[in-house]
Each structure stands twice: as structure tokens, then as C-alpha cells.
UniProtKB/Swiss-Prot annotation:
A zinc finger (RTR1-type) spans 36-121. The gene is rpap-2. Zn(2+) binds at residues 59, 64, 97, 101. It comes from the Eukaryota. Putative RNA polymerase II subunit B1 C-terminal domain (CTD) phosphatase involved in RNA polymerase II transcription regulation. This is Putative RNA polymerase II subunit B1 CTD phosphatase rpap-2. The lineage of its organism: Eukaryota, Metazoa, Ecdysozoa, Nematoda, Chromadorea. One of its GO terms (cellular component) is nucleus.
Length: 455
């Protein structure tokens, strides 16, 4: 029987093979060698090859012997304010000598596997796949940038023919007999003589007027609508009008003089008690679940914040300074009876059950992956058992993820200021939670207050 290789040794050998492939592709010369090594790479491994070649002052695409052009950058560094770190400002296109090499690299990267070799192993789909490596006849799907228009004018001067076009209708043109002199002149323009019409200009204006009148008729004069004044009634006619109005009022009555009835007020109906109890029950089970998770360590983490810890050494020193007595029996590391850590296993099951829903919330809120580390740190302090780690529906898991996000907002003060300003939920978080699990702004604010009271 063949002896099976341990999993750790397999993973180590696959990792070493990927690193060797990256080192080989740094100094590769032809595309045939490149095609042999592609089954060992994944997308991030290809990015490492491009980065290493760029650091070595080579074009990012393997088998290209040219160097990337030197580009003067206005911005050398990029600041991440939330993480408090400074990164070097780089663009992916600047790592290649031309647009063609950049398109070749993108073409090869799309064919690679997303998962690394040490996770998938040498599967048949990976080894038997035919990778296409672009050569010099490769046609880029994106056309190269054309030269600016100004440079074309400088290189090839040409004559531009402009067709005649009517700017305005002739009947709408307004021509003046004489040009009006400007009312006020600037002190700089006082020496310039005002423009005066010559005899030729007057003849030209006269001919245009004749052409307009012969083809379109004389210009229409603006007729102002004059409102006729109201006729003044004589005393006899006014008396007749009053008599007619009196007869009409006596016959039909003056409805405007009657007192209007007060409007009918209908009291708003109260929400059905069953709906109220359903809304309260929706928050009650979630608050009870959070209560079952919370431990003194969780409350301490919420109060102190997610500060970096010094590990076991710092914990021993803090226990000594606080005068805490250490139980000697607990210091003895006894083997587990069932060969694995139950608490760690439950924690992994819990994080795995909410992982996809949490990543969806991260993408919607544009959160950094470091918030996921805070989630793991907070969840490690929970009191988990077999009944409160899994077994929920998708809608319930979305509600649990929103509640866990509220807990992380209490731990991370900066994140809490962004989404719970003055203990009120932000419109962005309200819209997302309403879409995922049907929680509105009042329910999220009440859930935030309930969780905060437990800390």
C-alpha cells in the first residue's frame, strides 16, 4: 500500500511550487515557458508576478524585455483615514510598457483559477486546461488611445471648408439706421474713435431692408391690447341692477352667508394589536438571543473598545497588578476528552453560518475587511451552545447580522459615529436593513438602545 502524504506537507509543497513559478516568470524569455507554468498560478499569483517584474524595472507581462515608461506622478502616496495608514499610489497600467502588454496580461489573468494551488490541488480541470498565451499578433479588444486633436493640427495643416448656413431668419433681424454710441467708455478706450457708418454701410443696410420687404412684407407693428374701461352706470341703471340682485337673493337665498358646518373629524384607527405584538416579538427574540451570547468579557470589550492586546503575557501582568488570584488547577493543560476544542468548534460553526450574509452587508455598506476581524474577536467572547449557533432562516440571519453590526458599532466608536449619530440609525443603514430583514428606522434605533443597555 502506498503511504499517504500528510495534508500539511502537501500544502507546503504546493506553496513552494507556486513561489518557484513566480520566481521563474520574473526572468522568462519566451511564451512557451509561460504556458507550461500557468496551471500552477492563480489570479493573485499572477498579480505577484506583475508586481515583482515591475519592482525589477521590467514590463509586467512575462516574456517582454522592455521596461515600463517613467511616469511623473503628481500624487505619490494615498492616505486611508479609517485605517490610519499611508500607501504608495500606484496604477496597474503603469506597470506595463504599453497598452498591448496590459491587455495581454488581462487576457491571461481571466483564464486562471481564482483559488490557489494549495487549496484545489492538481485537479484534472486545472492540468488538462489549454491556456491561450497571446503572441505579437494579439489584437487588443480596446482600441489604443488616439492622439489629441491639437497634435493632429500641428502635424498636418489642412484647409477646412465650412458650408453656408442661415444663422437667423431675415424677418427676425433688427437693423438700425445708425449705430448708437456707447454711453460710457473705459479710461483705457477713451483714445479709440467711436465707429461711424459710412455711405457704403448705409447702402448695404438699405438693400437688406428692401429685400426683406419685397419677400416677406413690411415688419408687423406691435399692437398693444388695450383693455376697455368699465362702463359707468347711471343712478337709474344702478337701481335696476340692485333690484334684480335683491330678487335673485330672495328666490335662491344667499348660500355664502349661511354658516358652514364644521368638518367631520374621523379619528385614526389604532394599529391592530396583533400587528403590534408581532413587531414586538420580532425584536424580543433578537434581544433575547443577544442576551444569551453576552458574557462579562463581551461587556468589557464593548466598554474598552477594540484596542490591540499584548497576548497572554500582558494578561498575566494585568492579573498580577490587579491582585487577581490564579487557580493553580486551571494552569494545567489537560487533553480534551473528545480530541477537539468544543468552544472553538462552536465558534467556527457560528461564523460559518453568518459568513455570506455578513459579506453581503459589508459590500452594501462599503466596509473594509478589518471589520470582519472585530466580528471574530467579539464572537470569541460569546457564550455559545448547541441551540444558539445555527438553525435560522435567511431572513432571521439577516436580522442577526444587523444586530451584530450594532454590537461592532458599540465596540468601534468611529464606525458608530458614522451609522448611529446621536443614537439614531443612519438612512443608509435603515434602507439596507429594511430591504434585507424588514426592520425600519424605529426598530433599529430600539434594538440599538436595547443592546446598549446590556453593556
Amino acid at each position: 500500500m502506498e503511504t499517504e502524504i500528510p495534508v500539511n506537507e502537501k500544502e507546503t509543497s504546493f506553496r513552494r511550487r507556486v513561489y518557484t513559478t513566480i520566481e521563474t516568470l520574473i526572468d522568462i524569455e519566451n511564451t512557451d515557458q509561460l504556458q507550461e507554468h500557468l496551471p500552477h498560478l492563480h489570479c493573485l499569483g499572477w498579480d505577484e508576478v506583475v508586481e515583482e517584474r515591475y519592482v525589477n524595472k521590467q514590463c509586467g507581462f512575462p516574456s517582454c524585455q522592455k521596461a515600463p515608461p517613467k511616469i511623473t506622478r503628481n500624487q505619490m502616496f494615498e492616505i486611508d483615514r479609517k485605517e490610519g495608514k499611508i500607501f504608495e499610489f500606484r496604477k496597474q497600467r503603469a506597470k506595463f510598457c504599453s497598452e498591448m502588454c496590459y491587455q495581454k496580461s488581462s487576457f491571461v489573468r481571466k483564464q486562471l483559477d481564482e483559488h490557489p494551488l494549495w487549496i484545489t490541488g492538481l485537479t484534472e480541470a486545472r492540468t488538462q486546461k489549454v491556456y491561450e498565451v497571446p503572441d505579437e499578433s494579439f489584437v487588443s479588444p480596446i482600441a489604443e488611445k488616439s492622439e489629441p486633436v491639437d497634435s493632429q493640427f500641428k502635424k498636418e495643416p489642412s484647409i477646412w471648408l465650412v458650408t453656408d448656413s442661415i444663422i437667423a431668419k431675415v424677418q427676425d433681424m433688427k437693423l438700425s439706421e445708425e449705430a448708437e454710441e456707447p454711453k460710457s467708455l473705459d479710461p483705457e478706450d477713451q483714445d479709440i474713435e467711436p465707429f461711424k457708418l459710412t455711405d457704403d454701410d448705409k447702402d448695404f443696410i438699405k438693400s437688406i431692408k428692401e429685400f426683406r420687404n419685397s419677400n416677406f412684407g413690411p415688419p408687423s407693428t406691435s399692437k398693444l391690447l388695450k383693455t376697455a374701461p368699465k362702463p359707468v352706470l347711471s343712478a337709474k341703471d344702478r337701481k335696476k341692477e340692485d333690484e334684480v340682485l335683491a330678487k335673485l337673493r330672495a328666490k335662491y337665498g344667499n348660500k355664502n352667508a349661511l354658516q358652514k358646518k364644521p368638518p367631520i373629524l374621523i379619528e385614526a384607527q389604532e394599529i391592530h394589536s396583533k400587528l403590534k405584538t408581532m413587531e414586538k416579538a420580532k425584536e424580543a427574540w433578537l434581544v433575547d438571543l443577544i442576551k444569551s451570547w453576552f458574557t462579562p468579557e463581551t461587556r468589557k470589550l464593548v466598554r474598552e473598545g477594540a484596542r490591540p492586546t499584548g497576548g497572554a503575557a500582558e494578561q498575566i501582568l494585568m492579573d498580577f497588578l490587579s491582585g487577581k488570584k490564579v487557580d493553580a488547577e486551571k494552569l494545567v493543560n489537560l487533553p480534551n476528552l473528545d480530541k477537539y476544542n468544543v468552544k472553538e468548534k462552536r465558534l467556527n460553526i457560528f461564523l460559518h453560518s453568518i459568513r455570506n450574509h455578513w459579506m453581503d452587508l459589508e459590500a452594501r455598506l462599503h466596509l473594509t475587511p478589518t471589520r470582519r476581524d472585530i466580528l471574530s474577536r467579539v464572537a470569541s467572547t460569546f457564550q455559545l451552545d448547541s441551540e444558539n449557533i445555527t438553525g435560522w432562516t435567511k431572513r432571521e440571519i439577516n436580522s442577526i447580522v444587523i444586530a451584530l453590526f450594532i454590537v461592532i458599532c458599540l465596540v468601534d466608536v468611529e464606525l458608530g459615529d458614522d451609522y448611529f449619530k446621536k443614537d439614531n440609525a443612519s438612512p443608509e443603514l435603515t434602507a439596507i436593513s429594511n430591504e434585507l430583514c424588514g426592520l425600519d428606522s424605529f426598530q433599529i434605533t430600539g434594538l440599538h438602545a436595547a443592546i446598549k443597555s446590556q453593556c
